[in-house]
Each structure stands twice: as structure tokens, then as C-alpha cells.
Amino acid sequence: MKHAENEYLNLCRHVMEHGTKKEDRTGTGTVSVFGYQMRFDLSKGFPLLTTKRVPFRLVASELLWFMKGDTNIRYLLQHNNNIWNEWAFKSWVESDEYTGPDMTDFGLRSQQDEEFKVQYDEQMELFKKNVLEDDDFSNKYGYLGDVYGKQWRAWKTTAGETLDQLKDVIEMIKKTPDSRRLIVSAWNPEDVPSMALPPCHTLFQFYVADGKLSCQLYQRSGDIFLGIPFNIASYSLLTHLIAHECGLEVGEFVHTIGDAHIYTNHFEQVEKQLAREPRPFPKLTLNPDVKSVFDFEMEDLTIEGYDPHPAIKAPVAV
């Protein structure tokens, strides 16, 4: 039987073979295709990729952060999650209050210049310490703008009110499961200019059939090597959590990507991953005593039987 991970591996192959060379906002360069869809049957294992290690702890803590409506990286740092650091760090080193060494193009330079990397690591550690310990600093530089959590839980209306999209869609799944309006959007055009990184995963929709909950994500932009594996696991986890609260089984996670791209400095890593054979997907177990999705904490989520190939490191484009 074909392993479900081939949905992702075939995406990698397709883009490497047929992608168009494009410049991008970060100056790194990509090959990309427009419009691609993957499907994962969540009843047949949790799609945490096995051809390289994907850190479930980071996926889960980021999702819980989104679900809390939080937009400050302090919560993430408190859970040893550093995946959003670079975007917040950028706002600090570009501010008038920053007096350290020049950090221009720190993402690329830290990969190419060992002497600079020492300085970068020192400044990043100082930044993290300040976010964790200094409330004023955290409020100013740990804040990412009205990113995912804010849009999910407190979307601002023109009437000056807020909409809790996530809470509302869960209630709709319970009361009107056949609705075609089971949608949450993170793309708020008015707020996009103020965001550290405008939403890449922009809109998701739920679908209930035969007692199963499925989810489709529309992702406007997908970093195939670093980002997409996280997104697959994150929205699969979200589907499990909401199905749990609504008394449903899990169905499919359908992942639709607009600009699906591989950065030019990830080619070697992608080839290395494609040379590996997938292993069985792990099993996700949720604490049955937790009834609401908003009450889950890290200790309530368990992954069993995860035996991936080793991690493959790659630079992030900021």
C-alpha cells in the first residue's frame, strides 16, 4: 500500500522537476508551482513526517498559542519554542533602541559567516532573555502584530466589535454540521501591513460527513521544506482537537497550497529527504478528561510510535 507520506514527497518531486524559478521577498530565490493539493486520511495515523524528524512539541505549542489568541512570542519561549523568534528579533534590531552590532540580513549572514554567527547568537539570547523577563520589552518587541491568534479569536469588525471565529465555528459544527460556512479566516486585509509575517495559512474550512470531521486548509504560500511539514501536523492536530470536543471521529486533512515553493538553499536537504523511505505514522492520543479545545495543555497531547529518520537542518528565510 502506498504510504501517505508520499503525498508530501511527491509535492517535493513535482516542484523540483517542474517548478518555475522565481525571486522572492527574502532575496533567497525559489522554484515554485501554483496550485497543489494533498490529502491525508487522519484515521490511518497522525501525519507527522517520518523522512525527517518534525518536532511535535513545537507544532503543538504553536497551535495552542494560536488557539489562545496570543500574538506575543513570550508564551512560545516559555515552552522552549523558537520558531517565531526571527520575525520578532527583526523588529528589535531595526529599531532606534537597538545599539548592538549590525544585524542586517542576519538570517543569511548567520549561515555564511561564523564570526557573525557568534554575534548573532549573543544578540538573540539577549533578545529572548529580555522578552521573558522584561514586560515592557516583551510588549514592544515580542509582539508580532495581529497575526493568527488574533484573527482566529478576536477579529476586529468595522463596528468596533470582535468575532471569536474559532469558538463560533466549533459551535456551528455542533449545531449545524451540514453547514457550508464552517470557515475561519486569518487573512484580514486591513491588518496585513502591521503583521510581522502576513498569514501563510490563510483560511480553513470544516466538513462533517458520516460522523467524521474533515478540514481543508488554503495556504497562500508554502515553504515546502521547513514550513509545510509543520502545517500538515498543526492542522491535523487542530482537526483532532475539534473532533474530540464535538464527539466526532477524524476524517481527512486536505491541504491546498497556492504558491508552493522550495528555496534554492534547501535543494540539497530536499534531495537528502527524498532518498529516505517513509516509516509508519505515529498515533496521537488526547487526554479524554479534557472536554474543550481551549483547555488543552501540552501534557494532554501524546504522540506514540514516532520513529523518524534524523532531522535535516536548513536556514529559514526571514
From Swiss-Prot:
Catalytic residues as annotated in Swiss-Prot or TrEMBL: 200 (nucleophile)
Gene Ontology biological process terms from the UniProt entry: dTMP biosynthetic process; dTTP biosynthetic process; methylation
Binding site for (6R)-5,10-methylene-5,6,7,8-tetrahydrofolate: 223, 317
GO molecular function, one term: thymidylate synthase activity
Subcellular location: Cytoplasm
Principal localisation: cytoplasm
This protein's UniProt keywords: Cytoplasm, Methyltransferase, Nucleotide biosynthesis, Transferase
Any Pfam family hit: Thymidylat_synt
PROSITE patterns assigned to the protein according to its UniProt record, in alphabetical order: THYMIDYLATE_SYNTHASE
Pathway: Pyrimidine metabolism; dTTP biosynthesis
Annotated binding of dUMP, by residue: 25, 180-181, 220-223, 231, 261-263
Reaction(s) catalysed (UniProt annotation): dUMP + (6R)-5,10-methylene-5,6,7,8-tetrahydrofolate = 7,8-dihydrofolate + dTMP
Top-level lineage group: Bacteria
One GO location term (cellular component): cytosol
Signal peptide: none
Record-listed E.C. numbers: 2.1.1.45
Family note: Belongs to the thymidylate synthase family. Bacterial-type ThyA subfamily.
Function: Catalyzes the reductive methylation of 2'-deoxyuridine-5'-monophosphate (dUMP) to 2'-deoxythymidine-5'-monophosphate (dTMP) while utilizing 5,10-methylenetetrahydrofolate (mTHF) as the methyl donor and reductant in the reaction, yielding dihydrofolate (DHF) as a by-product. This enzymatic reaction provides an intracellular de novo source of dTMP, an essential precursor for DNA biosynthesis.
Subunit structure, as described in the record: Homodimer.
Name this polypeptide is given: Thymidylate synthase
Annotated organism of origin: Bacillus cereus (strain ATCC 10987 / NRS 248)
